[in-house]
C-alpha cells in the first residue's frame, strides 16, 4: 500500500462483543484513521463495532463511506450520519464494492460475516487479483486461535510461507497502519486477472 493510500476498509462485528476492549479498539482505529486523513470504507451500519468505528471517524472530522445491502437497510441498521452510503442488492456486490474502493483492509473482532469479508480480500491478494495489504488487529487476544490455525495450516503444507506472511498482525492501531503503509506485495505468481474474480 503506498504511503499516500487514503481509503481503508475495516471489517468488524455488528455486535459489540463481550468485552469493552473491542469497542475501545474500534474507536481507536476510527480516531487514527481520521487523524491520518484516511477515508473509512465499511459495511454502512450504525450497530455494534461498526457503529462505534464510524462514529469515531466522524467525530475526528474524517470521511466515511458505507456500503450496505437493501435487506439490511430495510432492517433500519444503516448509519444515517454518513456522507456516502451506497445501497446494493447482494452481499457479493457489497464485498466487491468495498474491495474496489479500498487501498487496504483491516479486520477487527467479529463473527462469520467479518471473517468472510476479510478472507475473501486476503485470497484476492494471494491470487494476485489485487495488491493491497490485509491486516488483523488482535484485540484482547481475540484472534489468537485464528492466527494459530493459520500457522497450523502453513505447518501442514496448506499455506505457503509467503502467503502466511501476507497477513499483517498487531495490537496497536497506529503501528498496524504504519506497517500497512510500508507493506510491499509478495513476489508471487499472479494467478488471476481482476476481471476473473
What is each model feature region?
Residues 124:
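CoA-thioester-processing core
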Residues 1-102, 118, 139-174, 178-179, ...:
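A cross-family phosphate/adenosyl-ligand binding-site feature
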Residues 105:
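Hydrophobic acceptor-binding patch used for acceptor engagement in glycosyltransferases
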Residues 88-89, 110-112:
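N-terminal glycine-rich "phosphate-gripper" loop used for MgATP/nucleotide binding
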Residues 130-132:
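His-Asp phosphorelay/catalytic-motif detector in bacterial-type signaling
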Residues 135:
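Conserved beta-strand/loop subsegment of P-loop NTPase cores
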Amino acid at each position: 500500500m503506498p504511503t499516500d493510500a487514503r481509503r481503508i476498509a475495516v471489517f468488524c462485528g455488528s455486535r459489540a462483543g463481550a468485552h469493552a476492549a473491542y469497542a475501545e479498539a474500534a474507536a481507536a482505529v476510527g480516531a487514527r484513521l481520521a487523524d491520518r486523513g484516511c477515508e473509512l470504507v465499511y459495511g454502512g451500519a450504525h450497530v455494534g463495532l461498526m457503529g462505534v468505528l464510524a462514529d469515531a471517524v466522524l467525530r475526528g472530522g474524517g470521511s466515511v463511506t458505507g456500503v450496505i445491502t437493501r435487506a439490511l437497510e430495510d432492517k433500519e441498521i444503516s448509519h444515517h450520519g454518513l456522507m456516502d452510503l451506497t445501497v446494493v442488492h447482494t452481499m457479493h456486490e457489497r464485498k466487491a464494492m468495498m474491495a474496489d474502493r479500498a487501498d487496504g483492509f483491516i479486520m477487527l473482532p467479529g463473527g462469520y460475516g467479518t471473517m468472510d469479508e476479510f478472507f475473501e480480500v486476503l485470497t484476492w491478494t494471494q491470487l494476485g487479483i489485487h495488491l493491497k495489504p490485509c491486516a488483523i488487529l488482535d484485540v484482547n487476544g481475540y484472534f489468537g486461535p485464528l492466527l494459530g490455525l493459520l500457522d497450523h495450516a502453513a505447518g501442514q503444507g496448506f499455506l505457503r510461507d509467503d502467503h502466511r506472511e501476507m497477513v499483517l498482525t498487531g495490537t496497536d492501531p497506529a503501528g498496524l497502519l504504519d506497517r500497512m503503509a510500508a507493506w510491499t506485495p509478495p513476489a508471487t505468481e499472479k494467478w488471476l486477472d481482476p476481471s476473473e474474480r
